[in-house]
Amino acid sequence: MLAKSPLKIVLCSPRGFCAGVVRAIDTVERALALYGAPVYVRHEIVHNKYVVDSLRAKGAIFVEELEEIPDTKAPVVFSAHGVPKSVPEHALSRNFFSIDATCPLVTKVHREAAIHFKRGREILLIGHSHHPEVVGTLGQLPAGAVTLIETAADAEAYQPKDPNNLAFVTQTTLSIDDTAGIVTVLRERFPNISGPHKEDICYATTNRQAAVKKVAPVVDAMIVVGAPNSSNSQRLREVAEREGCKVAVLVQRASDLDWSQFEGIKVLGLTAGASAPEVIVEEIMGAFAERFDLSVETVSAAEENEFFPVPRVLRPDAAE
């Protein structure tokens, strides 16, 4: 039997679930425990197939729009990404028992946008079109009240009605560096533009990207556990590439690994997006352990202790 080649795995810390994702998953599981199946969920509760399939097996039914739900007294949960105002209004018109699992840090962005609108400012939203979080934020205000800025070129081209009456907010899962570049353009062009008191890009996005920045330059390849439609996971892969990692791949499960990409490597970086469970990280490490003689090191960029309680209606004291 041939001896296994040595491989050092460098685990990024923090990685995986953030407080908003834990809250969203707990919301669906608590609703199932309290009210029984089915529990309807508009859109994937978080962007991870393993999580969605696990909840589906417990009795959650996932839909893209409320029109797909029959008249029911079952709970209807809104995903962590947030929804346009029209969605809860529609739910109310059908007498649905709706539960909002929007991440509190996304809700913070919604509130910021509403305050700017109330003050009569033109609002710019830095984000990626069609992402459900962006759709939800745009949908907090009347059509045309918010302009989407996706790139520094968009920021350069934007022509406001009043350059002294502008504000910006951002999607919570963006690239720190890309967003900083866009904000720099906006502040140079419009020195009086109002921004968030605290960065809209969330702590989890920031910390996970910081960990990848520390690890990517010292590894031969980087694996990011996450779904293709997960914005924060895709950003982690991009950060690894920018930091000089020649092989940076996004995978959902160990079965997705293309082993030809890892031939001859000596050091592998491993992280997970904010919606990816640790069990998949362990699964991937197990797959590498079958082929390599592993040693493991953890590199930390931050400590996390954030916690968001589930919506009030699901808390034990709700009936008191």
From Swiss-Prot:
GO terms for biological process: dimethylallyl diphosphate biosynthetic process; isopentenyl diphosphate biosynthetic process, methylerythritol 4-phosphate pathway; terpenoid biosynthetic process. Binds 1 [4Fe-4S] cluster per subunit. Isopentenyl diphosphate binds at residues 47, 81, 131, 230-232, 275. It comes from the Bacteria. It catalyses: isopentenyl diphosphate + 2 oxidized [2Fe-2S]-[ferredoxin] + H2O = (2E)-4-hydroxy-3-methylbut-2-enyl diphosphate + 2 reduced [2Fe-2S]-[ferredoxin] + 2 H(+); dimethylallyl diphosphate + 2 oxidized [2Fe-2S]-[ferredoxin] + H2O = (2E)-4-hydroxy-3-methylbut-2-enyl diphosphate + 2 reduced [2Fe-2S]-[ferredoxin] + 2 H(+). Its EC number is 1.17.7.4. The active site is at residue 133. Disulfide bonds: none annotated. GO terms for molecular function: 4 iron, 4 sulfur cluster binding; 4-hydroxy-3-methylbut-2-enyl diphosphate reductase activity; metal ion binding. Its cofactor is [4Fe-4S] cluster. Pathway: Isoprenoid biosynthesis; dimethylallyl diphosphate biosynthesis; dimethylallyl diphosphate from (2E)-4-hydroxy-3-methylbutenyl diphosphate: step 1/1; Isoprenoid biosynthesis; isopentenyl diphosphate biosynthesis via DXP pathway; isopentenyl diphosphate from 1-deoxy-D-xylulose 5-phosphate: step 6/6. Dimethylallyl diphosphate binds at residues 47, 81, 131, 230-232, 275. Gene3D superfamilies: 3.40.50.11270, 4-hydroxy-3-methylbut-2-enyl diphosphate reductase, catalytic domain. [4Fe-4S] cluster binds at residues 18, 103, 202. Pfam families: LYTB (PF02401). (2E)-4-hydroxy-3-methylbut-2-enyl diphosphate binds at residues 47, 81, 131, 172, 230-232, 275. Keywords: 4Fe-4S, Iron, Iron-sulfur, Isoprene biosynthesis, Metal-binding, Oxidoreductase. Belongs to the IspH family. Catalyzes the conversion of 1-hydroxy-2-methyl-2-(E)-butenyl 4-diphosphate (HMBPP) into a mixture of isopentenyl diphosphate (IPP) and dimethylallyl diphosphate (DMAPP). Acts in the terminal step of the DOXP/MEP pathway for isoprenoid precursor biosynthesis. PANTHER family: 4-HYDROXY-3-METHYLBUT-2-ENYL DIPHOSPHATE REDUCTASE (PTHR30426:SF0). HAMAP family: IspH. This is 4-hydroxy-3-methylbut-2-enyl diphosphate reductase 2. The gene is ispH2.
